[in-house]
Design a protein with these regions (language model features):
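Hinge/lid segment of periplasmic solute-binding proteins
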Residues: 102-115
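N-terminal secretory/targeting leader peptides
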Residues: 1-95, 114-115, 119-307
């Protein structure tokens, strides 16, 4: 490549997160393989520059940025098939979820995103299993959520989950969610432990329940027009870099979960580990969603997921 190709990668978290480190992993790989053929720059957290977290969607789609990531739930308005992976208690563990997202289900969902967005989907980062935190009381059963105002991702499926659990779900972007957690105008939120700590929620929420209610992925998307203009050498290098970065990010995320739990405990918070019976009560409460999903999404989606 005679002229350096600009690659602008961005996210919405500090440089210390698994996601930011994985973007750097991709950039380092590209520079190692292509040298002066690429000009790689990073914006770790677009919120530091006055953007909302969900602005990363249009920033990449318009080509202002080359590559980014976002939780799949943010894309459900234009790619409703992604609502399938918002279903509660869909996957039992990381291995099952990763097999689905790396396999037929992930390929199908990537195709649906590319049909509706000006993206090329390069892979899936792991946001992982999500847990409930709140400022009011310990949560052991759905009844403990009664009347709680809880921030959820912009997903109708996720909102219905918490309606069935008796809470009052409020769909909002991360930027607003952080403001409202700090201000106390929402009672609860749900996130992987790493996100809860990264955004300082554990300093305002004393009670944390390890509910594992959703498993969410973050598609890694690139500006399609840019990708299509790249030489094959860069396309191949990017695909290899992202493949390895996904494995790297998942390993980092596992350690982040351990470290984040300790940070929550060190803050003096209370962590609830559900008993088998308590967990079953949550699963039973949201059972109607799985019945409806077979009509909404079709049995084929469950087959693609290996379920």
């Amino acid at each position: 490549m005679s002229k350096a190709i600009q690659i602008r990668m961005a996210g919405y978290g500090p440089s210390t997160t698994a996601f930011s480190k994985s973007l750097k992993f991709i950039g380092d790989r590209l520079e190692a393989e292509l040298g002066d053929g690429v000009d790689v720059k990073y914006v770790w957290n677009i919120m530091d520059f006055g953007y909302r977290a969900d602005d990363i969607l249009w920033l990449v789609e318009s080509g202002v940025l080359t590559l980014g990531y976002q939780s799949s739930s943010y894309l459900t308005d234009r790619a409703p098939e992604l609502g399938f992976v918002d279903l509660p208690f869909l996957f039992a563990n990381n291995d099952q979820a990763r097999a689905a997202m790396d396999g037929a289900l992930g390929k199908y969902l990537a195709q649906k995103i590319e049909e509706r967005f000006n993206y090329r989907i390069l892979g899936w980062f792991e946001n992982g299993f999500r847990h409930i935190s709140n400022r009011l009381r310990p949560v052991h059963t759905p009844a403990d959520l009664a009347g709680m105002k809880i921030r959820v991702l912009p997903s109708d499926v996720q909102a219905r989950t918490f309606q069935l659990l008796g809470a009052e779900p409020l769909k909002m972007d991360l930027t607003e969610a952080i403001e409202r957690v700090v201000g106390g105008t929402v009672d609860a939120q749900e996130n992987p432990l790493a996100n809860t700590v990264t955004y300082g929620v554990h300093k305002f929420h004393r009670y944390h329940t390890l509910s594992n209610h959703f498993y969410i992925s973050r598609p890694i998307f690139a500006h399609r027009d840019s990708v299509e203009g790249w030489p094959d050498e860069l396309k191949d290098a990017m695909n290899r870099a992202v493949r390895d970065a996904v494995a790297y990010q998942r390993g980092l995320a596992e350690q982040e979960a351990v470290d984040s739990r300790k940070a929550i405990e060190d803050e003096g918070c209370e962590i609830v580990t559900l008993t088998a019976a308590e967990h079953a009560a949550f699963v039973k409460a949201v059972g109607p969603q799985h019945d409806d999903a077979r009509e909404t999404f079709g049995a084929e989606m469950f087959k693609l997921a290996g379920l």
